[in-house]
């Protein structure tokens, strides 16, 4: 007994010594408060330097400590003039960060400065700016700041010290931007002069002939909130029409090209994805559905997300594909797509969010930031020598756009994943991001991102999102006690990280009293809607004529093109992907571990799979992987479980079905790991694994002879496989490992109901209606591909 007590005392003394030796990475409340304070100090360092060296202009240059001004000499300088309208945009965009810091004195001081800057309460400034960017940065911040100033439950509530000036300014800017929607289609022009809001004669044609999907659709979110707060529905009606009209331009695969001519509706590029030019449409479909309790927006999100998973989803990211075919268009992803993991968290798709976020962590480990564009596939041309492949020449080839201006998207997703999982893995990332901001990006008068991640050259610019988003999300990551984390309101962050909520009284008043009385915009919408009805009638008549002709001259259904099944065999360049992590954080009864370090057995798969394009620049050679920081790894990993899968040796390819009927959203996942499809129409993309004995499979398991026992190759509807069915067992089999972007768990299967397009309702094929060469069904109800069973794909 005495011996046991001595052992226990020694253990306690050892643990106390370890704790005192290094409190870092324990993530106690004391430690998190220290990190939070450091972020707060960084924010005020940047903000105060802007006020001293940049105000009243739009930005401050962080290296040279002079204002960054609008380019008045060159009106075509889009990179500058689209955002810098000569209206102190850094001041306005930073207001909500001060509110989130819960710093009432500084919030009131900043609001007063805005009021003094615009004493007449209007933006009567001769500047041509981009409608979308000013909506999210100016109108969005003013609306959110107004909500903070008028909400008695918030720490920065201003009460009698505030008279609604920010809301009036937001409405004034909106009134200057809204004429951009007075086009023949109701889709907005990309730019507007906010002084001469009705005059478009000054714009060079090339500045007005293309608008991206995000810019045409997304202002709906801020403008709808403005309608709720002012009681004037014109903002909601006009911009919601544009959102719906933009969504209607999608292809038959429910994918949207990234940009259009707003008058002619012709697409400028066939490409689609989740990054720049389209990101906010998906974001505001889901966030608008939640904030406005809007089932139609939720349907847009569900359809769009399913289409993205089916056509764009790879193991670790969403690729840019052709909107009409779903085929890969370019072999790069951009930095803005890092936001999508956070959106997936909001949608409840946590497993996939975790995997997608990891891709951007590996980029940060490699480049010290997220390059604007990164090639995930090595370029074939020009051929490079071994020396070139390891140096700057190779980096030039894999980074089409090499800058990183401290964009917030990776910070944003890290924050949302931590809130959803409470995994210290994400706190550790935040600690390193904080360290990088202090040691690598903090400059004389602000924060300078990379002009070139290859050379490490810094950029003498601090865009407004550094203070309004990047530092805000980092602060919230460490602030467990922030009022936003304990609010009874449904708070939604805008795409510019401005918190939005709608008090019930505001909702009720708007629904009860709002009247659309503005004749200019109501008449314009009526004209646009009339054109839509006429166009729909012409399309319907055309379809009837074509259908009638086909019914006379062709045997089969009226729309042959839509019902011809297509099977496309493509070799997948991606190796197998991720598996789900355990939702809890405790292994055993005594110690806490990081689920990512202890359960996620593909944590380092990206490093090997993308080694050809994750090449460290010379200035990053001493930068260690964030997840392998010794202080963090030694404390939070569980040696018993922290293992990696053996890399698979099986061949992976894709099977693409284009079938008649409709695609089923959200198929049912049963407790026995079976995904069930009631219908199997539309497009489906199956990732197929070719199984051969003694290979390592997708899940890291050895394939044994037992897999090949009791295999049937007899097609119950055809004699095409009779010859091979009577011979020896097959040398390989097939297995589905992912379907429409959903990775099947180990021992998972797929069931397709018999009434789906693969079979008719009575279980027999109708050759006149449907024929797929190479597809059969055996007497185990397994689908067969060229007489080889897909052992986990059943027709039931």
Swiss-Prot record:
Catalytic activity as recorded in UniProt: Hydrolysis of terminal, non-reducing alpha-D-mannose residues in alpha-D-mannosides
GO molecular function: calcium ion binding; carbohydrate binding; mannosyl-oligosaccharide 1,2-alpha-mannosidase activity
Range of residues in the leader sequence: 1-20
Source species, domain of life: Eukaryota
Cofactor section: Ca(2+)
Binding site for Ca(2+): 495
GO terms classed as biological process: carbohydrate metabolic process; endoplasmic reticulum mannose trimming; positive regulation of endoplasmic reticulum unfolded protein response; protein glycosylation; response to unfolded protein; ubiquitin-dependent glycoprotein ERAD pathway
Residue numbers annotated as active site: 372 (proton donor)
EC number: 3.2.1.24
Keywords, alphabetical: Endoplasmic reticulum, Glycoprotein, Glycosidase, Hydrolase, Metal-binding, Signal, Unfolded protein response
Keyword Hydrolase: yes
GO cellular component, one term: mannosyl-oligosaccharide 1,2-alpha-mannosidase complex
Gene3D superfamilies recorded: 1.50.10.10
Pathway field: Protein modification; protein glycosylation
Glycosylated residues in this chain: 86, 517, 672, 762
InterPro entries assigned: 6hp_glycosidase-like_sf, EDEM1/2/3, Glyco_hydro_47, Seven-hairpin_glycosidases
Coiled coil: none
Subcellular location, record wording: Endoplasmic reticulum lumen
Subunit structure: Interacts with PDI1.
Purpose: Alpha-1,2-specific exomannosidase involved in endoplasmic reticulum-associated degradation (ERAD). Delivers misfolded glycoproteins to proteasomes. Forms a complex with PDI1 to process unfolded protein-bound Man8GlcNAc2 oligosaccharides to Man7GlcNAc2, promoting degradation in unfolded protein response.
Family: Belongs to the glycosyl hydrolase 47 family.
Additional note from the record: Present with 656 molecules/cell in log phase SD medium.
Name of protein: ER degradation-enhancing alpha-mannosidase-like protein 1
The gene coding this protein: MNL1
């Amino acid at each position: 007994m005495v011996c046991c007590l001595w052992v226990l005392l020694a253990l306690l003394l050892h643990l106390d010594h370890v704790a005192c030796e290094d409190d870092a990475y324990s993530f106690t409340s004391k430690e998190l408060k220290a990190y939070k304070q450091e972020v707060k100090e960084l924010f005020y360092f940047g903000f105060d330097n802007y006020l001293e060296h940049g105000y009243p202009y739009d930005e401050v240059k962080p290296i040279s400590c002079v204002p960054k001004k609008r380019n008045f000499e060159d009106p075509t300088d889009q990179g500058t003039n689209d955002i810098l309208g000569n209206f102190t945009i850094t001041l306005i965009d930073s207001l909500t960060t001060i509110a989130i810091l819960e710093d009432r004195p500084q919030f009131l001081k900043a609001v007063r400065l805005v009021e003094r800057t615009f004493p007449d309460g209007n933006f009567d400034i001769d500047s041509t700016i981009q409608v979308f960017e000013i909506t999210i940065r100016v109108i969005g911040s003013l609306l959110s700041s107004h909500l903070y100033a008028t909400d008695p439950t918030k720490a920065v509530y201003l009460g009698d010290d505030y008279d609604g000036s920010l809301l009036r300014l937001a409405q004034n800017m909106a009134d200057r931007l809204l004429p951009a929607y007075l086009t023949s289609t109701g889709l907005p022009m990309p730019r507007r002069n906010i002084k001469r809001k009705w005059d478009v004669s000054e714009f060079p044609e090339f500045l007005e002939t293309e608008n991206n999907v995000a810019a045409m659709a997304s202002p709906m979110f801020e403008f709808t909130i403005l309608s709720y707060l002012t009681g004037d529905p014109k903002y909601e009606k006009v911009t919601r029409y544009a959102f719906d009209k933009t969504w209607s331009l999608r292809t038959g695969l429910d994918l949207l090209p990234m940009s259009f001519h707003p008058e002619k509706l012709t697409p400028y590029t066939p490409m689609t994805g989740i990054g720049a030019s389209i990101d906010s449409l998906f974001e505001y479909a889901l966030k608008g559905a939640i904030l406005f309790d809007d089932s139609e927006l939720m349907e847009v999100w569900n359809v769009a997300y399913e289409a993205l998973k089916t056509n764009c989803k790879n193991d670790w990211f969403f690729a840019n594909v052709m909107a009409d075919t779903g085929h890969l268009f370019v072999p790069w992803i951009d930095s803005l797509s890092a936001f999508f993991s956070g959106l997936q968290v909001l949608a409840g798709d946590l497993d996939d969010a975790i995997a997608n976020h990891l891709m951007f962590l590996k980029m940060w480990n490699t480049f010290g930031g997220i390059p604007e564009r990164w090639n995930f596939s090595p370029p074939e041309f020009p051929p490079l020598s071994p020396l070139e492949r390891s140096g700057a020449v190779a980096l030039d080839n894999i980074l089409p756009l090499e800058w990183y201006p401290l964009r917030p998207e990776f910070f944003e997703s890290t924050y949302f994943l931590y809130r959803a999982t409470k995994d210290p893995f994400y706190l550790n990332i935040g600690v390193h991001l904080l360290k990088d901001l202090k040691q690598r990006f903090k400059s004389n008068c602000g924060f300078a991102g990379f002009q070139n991640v290859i050379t490490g050259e810094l950029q003498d610019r601090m865009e407004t999102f550094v203070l309004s988003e990047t530092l805000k999300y980092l602060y919230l990551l460490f602030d467990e006690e922030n009022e936003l984390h304990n609010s009874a309101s449904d708070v939604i962050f805008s795409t510019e990280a401005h918190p939005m909520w709608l008090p019930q009284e505001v909702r009720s008043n708007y629904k009860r009293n709002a009247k659309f009385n503005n004749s200019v915009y109501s008449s314009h919408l009526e004209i646009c809607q009339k054109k839509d009805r006429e166009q729909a009638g012409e399309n319907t008549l055309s379809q009837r004529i074509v259908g009638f002709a086909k019914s006379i001259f062709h045997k089969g259904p009226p729309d042959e093109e839509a019902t011809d099944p297509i099977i496309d065999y493509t070799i997948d360049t991606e190796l197998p992907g991720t598996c789900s992590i355990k939702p809890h954080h405790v292994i055993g009864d005594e110690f806490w571990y990081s689920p990512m370090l202890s359960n996620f057995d593909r944590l380092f798969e990206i490093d090997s799979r993308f080694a050809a394009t994750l090449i460290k620049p010379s200035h990053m050679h001493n930068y260690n992987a964030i997840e392998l920081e010794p202080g963090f790894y030694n404390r939070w990993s569980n040696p018993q479980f922290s293992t990696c899968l053996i890399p698979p040796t099986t061949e992976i390819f894709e099977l693409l079905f284009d079938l008649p009927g409709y695609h089923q959203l959200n198929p049912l996942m049963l407790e026995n790991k079976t995904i069930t499809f009631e219908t199997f129409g539309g497009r489906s993309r199956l990732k197929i694994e070719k199984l051969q004995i003694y290979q390592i499979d997708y899940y890291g398991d050895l394939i044994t002879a037992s897999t090949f026992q009791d295999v049937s190759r007899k097609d119950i509807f055809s004699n095409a496989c009779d010859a091979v069915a009577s011979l020896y067992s097959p040398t390989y089999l097939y297995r589905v490992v992912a379907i429409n972007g959903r990775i099947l768990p180990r021992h998972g299967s797929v069931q397709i109901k018999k009434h789906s397009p693969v079979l008719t309702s009575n279980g027999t094929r109708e050759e006149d209606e449907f024929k797929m060469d190479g597809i059969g069904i055996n007497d185990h109800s397994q689908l067969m591909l060229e007489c080889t069973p897909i052992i986990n794909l059943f027709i039931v």
